[in-house]
Amino acid sequence: MFGEKFRDRQKPMVLVLGLGESGLAMARWCARHGCRLRAADTREVPPNLSALEAHGVDAQFVGGPFSPVLLEGVELVAISPGLSPLAADLLPLIAAAREQGIPVWGELEFFSQALKTLGESGYAPKVIAITGTNGKTTTTSLTGLLCERAGRKVAVAGNISPALLDKLSEAIDNTALPDVWVLELSSFQLETAHTFSPDAAVVLNITQDHLDWHGGLDAYAAAKGRIFGTQTVRVLNRDDSRVMKLAPSEDSEAGMVTFGVTEPKNEGDYGLLRDNGMIWLVEAHDRDASDEPAPKRRRKNEVATPPNIALKRLMPADALRIRGLHNAANALAAYALARAIGLPGASLLHGLREYRGEPHRVELIASIDGIDYVDDSKGTNVGATVAALDGLAQRVVLIAGGDGKGQDFEPLAAPVMRWCRAVMLIGRDAPQIRAALEDTGIAMTDHATLEEATRAAAALAQPGDAVLLSPACASFDMFKGYAHRAAVFRGTVEEIAAERGTMI
């Protein structure tokens, strides 16, 4: 379960850094397989320390600042995804580990090594992986549903929770290993993966996020690119220039499929067709092919738009239960991933129609007097809010602000100018958003609370508008998390509905 290095010897002494969900899962996994353990956390009493003891994990615990001294006797380092290798307190330890030839693995690498070991006994699942700045959870959940509708036994795990190794342990214990793994992966998880090679994977988009963790946008994009193995079918968003830089080289054996909100031009690609006021999900395919063409493995620079290409209409976008063009793109990505592992299209289309979406992700929570109230509290970065505005494609009173995480808010200007009637600003970094939007000519007002901002937005909105909570910021300056922020928004909307004689 730990690769060739440790195959024919005593199980390694493992240092687990960080006792969050993934750190706890790695500790349990290593203990399960007979490893000696040392667990370290900057907190003297981390919340999961009691859980570690409750699971009977025998580990030496060290609380306080990280130090290279922790490496004494250690043969393998297991690092939690929330810990940046560039952090001042961690960098010396990681550098020392590499100098000493000690591998540094994250949970995804443990998972990858475990699948290789299980493969020696004949276990050969399909593995689908999803990453991107925005849309990961929606696309992961939808892909899992599509695979189920195609009759496969599916496990969905990763950044979406539960932890990868917990899900794998459960499957092993229950003798219920799945046919397909569908994994939501963050850039943090991918940073410490070395041998991961899924059958199909997608990068949905790359916009500013977690730049402090990675050290810059280029490093962040490179981490996203680690999702692809040498033979992984790459599903890429052709509307995102940074994503398309991850296309395979001409001499690569990897296949490539693209998706986007534009019409596809190459065989096997997916997109949207606008015809007579309707928007269709479509696939580009050879006019001479069967109704169920095999997933296309296309080279990076293959000549576009051959003469026998036609657009096959899959379903109207209006038949999706998730709102917005960005969600239509997510649906295409999920469909492309499922097709890339050979699943039949007909059953997948039924799944697309069935999926209802995830909470707090452009979620319609009420329509009151002709005004939609939309919860996108999970929109914690600029790219998510841009996608929500462009995806809804209607007049909006936007509620934005919070902890901006050092982002550049300038990309908000164009969609705000196009779609917004007004912007309600909240939170610590409201002044930065105001500065970025000051030349748009859109009215902006500052509010001390989300409740106040929601009521002000409701007063300004007109029938046909949406009041959209899409903060473009993290929530921790005012709330316990994005779910708490969403609950406050929903509670205020419920009060507004009751005052107007409506129940939601």
Swiss-Prot record:
List of residues binding ATP: 132-138
Catalysis: reaction(s): UDP-N-acetyl-alpha-D-muramoyl-L-alanine + D-glutamate + ATP = UDP-N-acetyl-alpha-D-muramoyl-L-alanyl-D-glutamate + ADP + phosphate + H(+)
Coiled coil: none
Region annotation Disordered: where it falls in the sequence: 286-305
Positions with biased composition (Basic and acidic residues): 286-295
InterPro entries, sorted: Mur-like_cat_sf, Mur_ligase_C, Mur_ligase_C_dom_sf, Mur_ligase_cen, MurD
GO cellular component terms attached to this protein's record: cytoplasm
Key words of the record: ATP-binding, Cell cycle, Cell division, Cell shape, Cell wall biogenesis/degradation, Cytoplasm, Ligase, Nucleotide-binding, Peptidoglycan synthesis
GO molecular function list: ATP binding; UDP-N-acetylmuramoylalanine-D-glutamate ligase activity
Pathway(s): Cell wall biogenesis; peptidoglycan biosynthesis
UniProt GO BP: cell division; cell wall organization; peptidoglycan biosynthetic process; regulation of cell shape
Entry's EC annotation: 6.3.2.9
Subcellular localization, as worded in the UniProt entry: Cytoplasm
Pfam families recorded: Mur_ligase_C (PF02875), Mur_ligase_M (PF08245), MurD-like_N (PF21799)
Entry-linked HAMAP family: MurD
Its biological purpose: Cell wall formation. Catalyzes the addition of glutamate to the nucleotide precursor UDP-N-acetylmuramoyl-L-alanine (UMA).
PANTHER family attached to this UniProt entry: UDP-N-ACETYLMURAMOYLALANINE--D-GLUTAMATE LIGASE
Family in the record: Belongs to the MurCDEF family.
Protein name: UDP-N-acetylmuramoylalanine--D-glutamate ligase
Organism of derivation: Paraburkholderia xenovorans (strain LB400)
